[in-house]
């Protein structure tokens, strides 16, 4: 069996990219994940990096988790088959996450990739929406608006919460 130069280059690039993703320095991990977003156009290059990218969602630093969410989003947007359980993964991440920026990014991911999961999350946290971060509230308002355009079972609840949140934002 002979290896082409092109195949060896892919293997070498995968190794070079996966090493910084496992680096102990959180900035290097985050920067590598940001780079991964930019090259999320080649499935062969991304495939060996998926497990490391998923593990970065559980990193102790929010900078790494935030960039891991973006990387998963970029990969899922281009190649759904590489991370078929990404909406469920983001939903469980969203429930467990404490950092407001990471929560907002994961929620935006759900809003773009699985509106049903985004609405499910909004319904599950409905009573605590006024106490959430403003950026997450704005994203929730957008999801409620989009959900109300459809014939949704949550339409009345969505309209009332949009009015409440809109009045909170004006003050």
Where are these regions (language model features)?
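Extended alpha-solenoid helical-repeat scaffolds
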Residues: 1-171
């Amino acid at each position: 069996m002979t290896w082409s130069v092109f195949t060896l280059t892919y293997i070498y690039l995968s190794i070079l990219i996966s090493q910084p993703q496992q680096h102990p320095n959180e900035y290097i991990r985050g920067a590598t994940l940001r780079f991964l977003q930019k090259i999320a156009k080649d499935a062969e290059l991304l495939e060996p990096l998926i497990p490391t990218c998923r593990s970065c969602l559980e990193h102790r630093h929010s900078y790494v988790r935030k960039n891991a969410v973006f990387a998963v989003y970029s990969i899922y947007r281009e190649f759904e088959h590489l991370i078929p359980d990404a909406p469920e993964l983001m939903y469980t991440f969203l429930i467990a996450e404490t950092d407001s920026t990471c929560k907002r990014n994961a929620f935006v991911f759900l809003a773009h990739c699985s509106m049903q999961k985004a609405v499910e999350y909004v319904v599950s946290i409905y009573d605590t929406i006024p106490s959430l971060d403003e950026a997450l509230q704005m994203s929730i308002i957008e999801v409620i608006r989009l959900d109300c355009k459809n014939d949704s079972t949550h339409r009345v609840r969505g309209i009332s919460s949009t009015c409440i949140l809109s009045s909170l934002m004006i003050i």
